[in-house]
């Protein structure tokens, strides 16, 4: 499926991980995966597959629509819990 979406013949899996959080755990802050990897390629594909039901009530994944087209993928540090910092850096994503 990824090959079809990316229009390529094959992929190489560089990294996999399982993120396990308790039901009462803190949410992950806004971030981009690519700047934290040990290589720099805007062509890399990151996917997230939920192993349990992911709902708004229990903290589902949320992507900013269009952010993959506008972001520069350079390491800039985390945004932490201050979502406003994200929109200060990328005002075009603010609604």
Residues covered by each model-derived region:
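Signature of the catalytic double-stranded beta-helix
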Residues: 1-17, 38-40, 51
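Short, basic and Ser/Thr-rich N-terminal targeting/leader segments
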Residues: 12-14, 23, 43, 57
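Short acidic (Asp/Glu) patches
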Residues: 23-35
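Short Gly/Pro-enriched turn/cap motifs at secondary-structure boundaries
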Residues: 37-38, 95
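Double-stranded beta-helix
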Residues: 54-95
């Amino acid at each position: 499926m990824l090959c079809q979406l990316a229009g390529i013949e094959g992929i190489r899996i560089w990294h996999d991980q399982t993120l396990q959080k308790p039901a009462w755990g803190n949410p992950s802050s806004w971030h981009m995966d690519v700047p934290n990897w040990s290589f720099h390629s805007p062509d890399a594909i990151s996917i997230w597959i939920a192993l349990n039901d992911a709902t708004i009530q229990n903290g589902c994944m949320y992507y900013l629509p269009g952010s993959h087209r506008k972001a520069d993928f350079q390491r800039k540090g985390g945004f932490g819990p201050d979502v406003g910092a994200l929109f200060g850096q990328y005002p075009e994503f603010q609604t």
